[in-house]
A protein has these predicted regions:
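N-terminal hydrophobic alpha-helical segments
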Residues: 40-42
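Residues embedded in well-ordered regular secondary structure
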Residues: 1-34, 73-74, 116, 134-136, ...
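Short, surface-exposed loop/turn segments at secondary-structure junctions
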Residues: 31-35, 287-290
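Extracellular/periplasmic, surface-exposed regions of secreted and cell-surface proteins
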Residues: 46-55, 60-65, 103-160, 171-448
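Intrinsically disordered, compositionally biased low-complexity regions
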Residues: 167-168
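Acidic, glycine-rich flexible loop segments
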Residues: 1-6, 76-113
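Short, glycine-/polar-rich solvent-exposed loops and beta-turns at beta-strand/coil boundaries
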Residues: 35-37, 73-75, 315-320
Length: 448
């Protein structure tokens, strides 16, 4: 069953506007059990205020808290999705006299396994704060500053427990062998910050229309994780990491990266028929070595509204507009994991026993790195035509494109196995593609 409860309020006047909302959602999972559940609580608020004629401030807040539980198949359970077993083996308990023991045990049916299954718990909390400041120092000129902060924390814990049942061959089994029951907990933290500031100028002089925009962008992202597991709980009713008597394992992880960019755009139109747009980005990413972090990515597009020319007046009765366009652009791709340009060594426990029954740590060979490691560049050429006809009822768009990716990061060389590590990533691969796309749309109305 799914339940949603929401409440909202909004209001304001000429200078201040606001809205607030809250919600509660409950949902049962597909399995018929109280162990499979999801619940989410959320609240949001938005305020926009015209402080004066030249300054407007906006604030947006969002908080979400979600809890999820679900049964987990562990050890010898053999799953609770095998519904075919229901027709062959009875629900309830198998008499101990048949099993050769004193106690009656539940049979290994999906229903029993689901009823006895241990439960995993996950809590996720998300906080988002964003602000927007708009300044209007002069007519046709605006300056906008934006900031966004995202925070996501996830915490989970699980205990495998131990219970006894009768398997399909009428043998008494434990779900987890003695001393192999385990308790684990995991915590992850994600943080994201983004700052944008840009300026727009929009003006028209007679037949000339001019727009200009320039700005700065900076983003940062960090990820932190912690995972711990211990076997053999001394107090199963209150599982904990400190209460484990068996093997313990702990792992953690951390990564971060930042992006810094400058960008600009220039638009010019003459009589709204001859169109020109110039774009440029200068992007830097911490995912690349210090001397190769920045790249410049320009683009250009032109358009001609042919249907607005005088020599096309003969087609006005059926042709509403026709536009020819062409563009060339390049963008950078940095969709890789951080630290790929660093040579690292991994430390892990050995499976080899030495004197005094002690294990030693093993350090892997350092990875190879390449001096060629920077942005991938995606270049695209596009030719297109837009047609509107028959009183805007028929619309057609046709595009032909050619795309090329230069300097794709790939394993550029073959490394002998005796080296003990993999080949380094290099900007050594290229990829080309081309194609066309046609889109036809008909819009009409029949009757009233």
């Amino acid at each position: 069953a799914l339940q949603n409860h929401n409440v909202s309020i909004s209001g304001g006047n000429d200078r201040i506007r606001f809205r607030m909302s809250a919600g509660l959602s409950r949902e049962d999972g597909p399995l018929i059990t109280s162990k499979d559940k999801y619940m989410r609580k959320n609240i949001s608020a938005f305020v926009s205020a015209d402080v004066n004629k030249w300054f407007t401030q906006e604030v947006n807040l969002l908080y979400t808290d979600a809890d999820k539980t679900n049964p987990v198949n562990v050890g010898n359970m053999s799953g609770f999705y095998t519904t075919r077993l229901v027709g062959y083996y009875p629900e309830g308990n198998i008499p101990g006299s048949i099993l050769g023991i004193e106690d009656d045990l539940p049979s290994q049916t999906p229903s029993n396994m689901l009823r006895l299954a241990p439960v995993s718990h996950l809590n996720t909390a998300v906080t988002r704060v964003s602000t927007r400041s708009v300044f209007k120092p002069l007519k046709d000129w605006t300056i906008t500053a934006e900031y966004t902060f995202d925070k996501k924390d996830a915490d989970s814990h699980f205990y495998s427990e131990r219970f006894r049942f009768a398997d399909v061959q009428l043998a008494a089994k434990w779900s987890v062998e003695s001393g192999q029951d385990y308790y684990n907990m995991q915590d992850t933290q994600k943080r994201y910050n983004a700052f944008n500031v840009f300026s727009n100028y929009d003006h028209r002089w007679g037949d000339h229309s001019f727009k200009a925009m320039a700005g700065f962008n900076q983003e940062s992202y960090s990820y932190k994780s912690f995972y711990a597991q211990v076997k053999g709980q001394t107090t199963p009713s209150v599982p904990s990491f400190a209460g484990g008597s068996g093997d313990k394992s702990i792992t953690d992880g951390y990564s971060e990266y930042s992006i810094r960019s400058g960008f600009a755009r220039l638009n010019y139109a003459f009589k709204d028929r001859y169109l020109l747009e110039l774009n440029g980005r200068y992007d830097g990413s911490s995912k690349f070595p210090k001397n190769d972090r920045f790249g410049f990515f320009p683009s250009l597009s032109v358009g001609w509204r042919l249907g607005q020319e005088k020599f096309m007046e003969w087609s006005r009765t059926w042709l509403d507009d026709i536009k020819l366009r062409a563009s060339y652009g390049s963008i950078g791709n940095q969709n890789i994991n951080p630290y790929q340009f660093l040579s690292t060594m991994t430390v892990s426990p050995s499976t080899v026993w030495l004197d005094k029954n002690d294990k030693v740590n093993v350090i892997s060979s350092p990875g190879l790195i390449s001096s060629s490691f920077t942005w991938e560049t995606v270049k695209t050429i596009n030719l297109g035509v837009d047609v509107t006809a028959l009183n805007n009822r028929l619309q057609m768009t046709f595009d032909y494109y050619k795309r090329r990716t230069d300097g794709m990061l790939a394993d550029g060389i073959e490394i002998p196995g005796v080296v003990g590590t993999s080949a380094p990533l290099q900007n050594i691969a290229d990829l080309s593609s081309d194609g066309w796309e046609l889109n036809l749309t008909w819009r009409d109305r029949i009757g009233d």
